Curated annotation (Swiss-Prot):
InterPro entries assigned: 4Fe4S_Fe-S-bd, 4Fe4S_Fe_S_CS, PSI_iron-sulfur_center, PSI_PsaC
The keyword Iron appears for this protein: yes
Protein name (record): Photosystem I iron-sulfur center
High-level lineage: Eukaryota, Viridiplantae, Streptophyta, Embryophyta, Tracheophyta
Assembly information from the UniProt record: The eukaryotic PSI reaction center is composed of at least 11 subunits.
Record EC number: 1.97.1.12
GO cellular component, one term: chloroplast thylakoid membrane
Length: 81
């Protein structure tokens, strides 16, 4: 089941989310916006099982990686005007 995975620019490039993902949905790509010069990317969202281990592993105060389960995404879209 595919879920929506969003990477925010608060990512510090620590790779914790990438290492926590059991289905290799995430990978690091070059980015000049942080000291680590890399940011998480989610090129394989079709493999996301919605376990949210990436969210749990994120050390930032504002989660830099968020998984929106299919039901959450649908509900949010239904409320948009």
């Amino acid at each position: 089941m595919s879920h929506s995975v969003k990477i925010y620019d608060t990512c510090i490039g620590c790779t914790q989310c990438v290492r926590a993902c059991p289905t290799d949905v995430l990978e690091m790509i070059p980015w000049d916006g942080c000291k680590a010069k890399q940011i998480a990317s989610a090129p394989r969202t079709e493999d996301c099982v919605g376990c949210k281990r990436c969210e749990s592993a994120c050390p930032t105060d504002f989660l830099s990686v968020r998984v929106y389960l299919r039901s959450e995404t649908t509900r949010s879209m239904a409320l948009s005007y």
